[in-house]
Amino acid sequence: MSNRVIIFDTTLRDGEQALAASLTVKEKLQIALALERLGVDVMEVGFPVSSPGDFESVQTIAKTIKNSRVCALSRALESDIDAAAQALSVAEQFRIHTFISTSTIHVENKLKRSFDQVLDMAVGAVKYARRFTDDVEFSCEDAGRTPIDNLCRMVEEAIKAGARTINIPDTVGYTVPSEFGGIIQTLFNRVPNIDQAVISVHCHDDLGLSVANSITAVQHGARQIECTVNGIGERAGNCSLEEIAMILSTRKGELGLETGINAKEIHRTSSLVSQLCNMPVQANKAIVGANAFTHSSGIHQDGMLKAQNTYEIMTPESIGLNRNNLNMTSRSGRHVIKHRMSELGYGEQDYDMDVLYEEFLALADKKGQVFDYDLEALAFMEAQAEDDDHFELQQLVVHSDSTEGSATATVKVAVNGETITEAATGNGPVDAAYKAVARASGCKTNITSYQLSAKGEGHNALGQVDITAKYREQNFHGVGLATDVVEASAKALIHVMNLTWRADKVADCKQRIQQNKQEFGSV
């Protein structure tokens, strides 16, 4: 048996079913091209009979993709198969994926037929799909809850009918690994023609076991895993592609299996899918979460500085990230601060480590995570009190035009103690407020991310706005909190402006240090 596991990506079919709004054809094509770069073997890109839009997107992708096989889904109905075949016909090679329910629950309650009738429908669908392509996949929907005798019969007959891939889905994410592995093993033991097809698995994450079940399945002989980028999909989602790829890569010695995935494209693909699908990746998500390669514990940070493999079983570079992060928090030791100052270009002679570390701990206790610009400001600015802000929002008044969608904001901003009043019109209240603040302060801020969340519940909830801005190749993080979202947004902007103002002051200090070094060196 081959040790190569086929990666069947269904982000654009099963994954898209979980989205609040459908993707456009252009967005689907962007994701398909990213999946091709990633190296997926097969991409299931839609359900053509479901809508003209889905038909168009399948056809467009099938025309474009060359290095992955494009697949479309169909029920065990000739009209569905016709639509799939027509949409895919523009591709040189393609796969038709047809399915029918096989569990007693589904057969009796959803299909309202006998199992023998369902078996005949499945065989007929596979034979009909073979008229269009040799590459036909058949799925036994809800296989995880199908009586094993019925499942073995269905698999054997589907292979006889011409299916070259047989998919065993845990449709409702119900099975546990030992149980699911046993199902796969039983199929290999009891289905006489099973060597004529690739056994595939499609596991859902309702109990958080989709990845574990998929790994167990390939240990028992399955050689295709159906998955999605970031694990998106119906209900609790699908098996996560990036987790499967990195498990098989990281534990290759133990599992003896491999994929054709270009792991260095994982992070880029994950970010694209998250952005286009408007589905943020949770920070603690394995492999691609923001904290996946971030270390906050002082003990862990010390180990990482001595040897990366003390606390990392894979490198961030392996998935296309530049480096890991050592979060500077109150748990960080002096060695971490010294290391970071060195990375920022400072020698021990440039600052007082005892004073810096004491001030660092005080700030970390107050705000949680300390960023590079905070650390530099602590080292080279005498005052870091929050009441010494250079910019202060004193007043904000917004008037919105509900018919045109525009808004006008008037602000009073204190700049180094002097109050300046300005007004501006924008595309909505937040845009207007930001333009007015920019006029009053004279600062242009390049905002790269904006996130709104609620603190508290009900009518007493506060709106929290978190923004990130790019300034002099550094990211600055601003936070604003208020009962009014526009006010919270303006406060977040003012926060960032004060940070960048301090950064300019630090830059002046750094320049003086460099000049002093040069003068000292020339004596």
From Swiss-Prot:
- The UniProt record gives the binding positions of Mn(2+) as 14, 202, 204, 238
- All copies of the Pyruvate carboxyltransferase domain together span 5-267
- Extract the Pfam families matched here: HCS_D2, HMGL-like, LeuA_dimer
A cellular component annotation (GO) from this entry: cytosol
Keyword annotations of the record: Amino-acid biosynthesis, Branched-chain amino acid biosynthesis, Cytoplasm, Leucine biosynthesis, Manganese, Metal-binding, Transferase
Q: Which GO terms describe its molecular function?
A: 2-isopropylmalate synthase activity; acetyl-CoA C-acetyltransferase activity; manganese ion binding
Entry EC number(s) = 2.3.3.13
Reactions that this protein is recorded to catalyse:
3-methyl-2-oxobutanoate + acetyl-CoA + H2O = (2S)-2-isopropylmalate + CoA + H(+)
Task: Report the pathway entry.
Answer: Amino-acid biosynthesis; L-leucine biosynthesis; L-leucine from 3-methyl-2-oxobutanoate: step 1/4
Q: Which cofactor does it need?
A: Mn(2+)
| GO BP annotations, alphabetical order | L-leucine biosynthetic process
Source domain of life: Bacteria
Q: Where is this region: Regulatory domain?
A: 392-523
Q: Where in the cell is it found?
A: Cytoplasm
Membership in a protein family = Belongs to the alpha-IPM synthase/homocitrate synthase family. LeuA type 1 subfamily.
What the protein does comes down to: Catalyzes the condensation of the acetyl group of acetyl-CoA with 3-methyl-2-oxobutanoate (2-ketoisovalerate) to form 3-carboxy-3-hydroxy-4-methylpentanoate (2-isopropylmalate).
Oligomeric state and interaction partners are given as: Homodimer.
The name under which this protein is listed is 2-isopropylmalate synthase
From what organism does this protein derive? Answer: Shewanella halifaxensis (strain HAW-EB4)
